[in-house]
Structures are given as structure tokens and as C-alpha cells.
């Protein structure tokens, strides 16, 4: 697994390249947002302790370009404009297939995953929020975004109802959301999710066919201001 540490403006981030990476090819992009335990300025902690990276190494083939930004503030929401700008910039990388951009996050990152998709539903082909929750009154904005949420039934940090109500509201509006509850899991529902190959197969089954038009607009904004 080829991993590099980079920085965009104030945000440090990890890039994981797919096996046999070819600069002439375009790859699906998986953006992964960590929980509160990963906050700070030391990106090496995220490298050493990332449950996602440890689980990712178990796969013989992992076709995604993966980007993992580091939250340098108290929460993702305290650097929301920075994070949004970072994600838009990442999506416009030349090796990214803009129709296959996916967002995943756990705990604090799960909340941010819900909110980022509600704020920018046109950017993502599908999302995977894990043990998070969100502003359910804005769920209509997710009606065209496929969602697979995960939560532990015994989670007393973020109650399962947080995921349940989001999924219910999205589906009430005619959306495509599903929820997996791990009956014996407490707050850590991410290890089981990260290690499940069906999650990545499900992500790749979704495409955002309107994304290229959106990316052209963002590229023009970057170029001309």
C-alpha cells in the first residue's frame, strides 16, 4: 500500500494510492473523515492508529484512491469552510473519476458525513455515515444520494436513534437509505464496517452521472475566480 502525507492550505492529509497506480487512469475516490480521537496537528498519529488503514491492508485489491484529512480544530464543524474547500479541491484532481466520489466517516466524522452530503449532495455518488447523526429536518437534500449507515445497538456515546431518524427521514422523502445495526456493538461500529468488503462493493455500484458538469464549474471557479 503506497501512502503519502500531504498538505493543502492548513489541512494535512493522507493519500492512499490503489495498487499498481497509473497516472494515466482515473480512479474512484473515497474520502474518509475520522472521529474526535484523531484531532490535532500530528498526522503520524492518524497513520499509526487508523483503524481504517489497518482494515484496508487486509484486502488483496482496493481500487479506490483514498484521502483522509486531519481535523486540526475541535470538530470538523469548526473548520467547515476549509473542509468543504478541501473536498472540492480533492475531487478535481486529474486522476479522480468525478462520477465515483464517496464519503465515509465515523462518530464525529459520521456527523460530518451526513452534513457534508446535505450541504453538497451533488458531489457524492454514495455515502457511508458510521455512528453519527445529523439535521434530520434537512433530510430532503439527501433524496438523490444513496446511503448506507451503520451503528452499534449498545452505543451510549452516540445513540442509535441518531442514525435511525436520519435514515427514516431520508426514506420518507423517497430517498435510498439503509441502516445496519450491530446488535452487540457499543460505540465502535467502524471496525466491523471498514473490514466488510460488501461496503466497498456497494459504494462502487453507485455513480453520480451529473458530477462532471459540477466539476467543470468548480474547475472554472478555481481557474478564473
Model-derived regions, located:
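Active-site machinery of serine-nucleophile hydrolases
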Residues: 29, 33-83
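A domain-start/cap signature at the N-terminus of enzymes
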Residues: 1-29, 64-65, 106, 111, ...
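Acidic catalytic loop of the alpha/beta-hydrolase fold
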Residues: 154-159, 188-189
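Catalytic histidine-centered segment of alpha/beta-hydrolase-like enzymes
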Residues: 185-193
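Alpha-helical scaffolding within the catalytic cores
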Residues: 45-58, 85, 131-139, 161, ...
Amino acid at each position: 500500500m503506497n501512502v503519502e502525507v500531504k498538505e493543502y492550505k492548513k489541512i494535512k492529509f493522507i493519500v492512499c494510492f490503489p495498487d499498481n497506480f497509473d497516472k494515466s487512469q482515473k480512479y474512484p475516490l473515497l474520502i474518509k473523515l475520522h472521529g474526535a480521537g484523531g484531532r490535532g496537528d500530528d498526522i503520524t498519529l492518524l497513520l499509526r492508529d487508523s483503524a481504517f488503514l489497518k482494515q484496508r491492508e487486509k484486502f488483496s485489491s482496493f481500487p479506490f484512491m483514498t484521502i483522509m484529512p486531519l481535523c486540526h480544530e475541535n470538530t470538523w464543524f469548526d473548520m467547515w469552510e476549509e473542509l468543504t474547500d478541501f473536498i472540492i479541491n480533492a475531487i478535481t484532481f486529474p486522476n479522480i473519476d468525478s462520477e465515483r466520489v464517496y464519503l465515509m466517516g465515523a462518530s464525529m466524522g459520521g456527523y460530518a458525513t451526513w452534513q457534508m452530503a446535505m450541504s453538497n449532495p451533488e458531489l457524492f455518488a454514495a455515502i457511508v455515515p458510521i455512528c453519527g447523526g445529523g439535521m434530520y429536518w434537512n433530510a430532503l437534500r439527501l433524496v438523490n444520494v444513496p446511503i448506507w449507515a451503520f451503528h452499534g445497538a449498545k452505543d451510549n456515546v452516540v445513540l442509535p436513534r441518531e442514525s435511525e431518524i436520519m435514515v427514516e427521514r431520508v426514506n420518507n422523502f423517497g430517498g435510498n437509505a439503509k441502516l445496519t445495526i450491530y446488535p452487540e456493538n457499543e460505540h465502535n461500529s467502524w471496525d466491523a464496517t471498514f473490514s466488510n468488503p460488501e461496503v466497498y462493493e456497494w459504494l462502487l455500484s453507485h455513480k453520480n452521472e451529473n458530477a462532471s458538469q459540477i466539476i467543470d464549474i468548480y474547475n472554472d471557479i478555481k481557474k478564473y475566480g
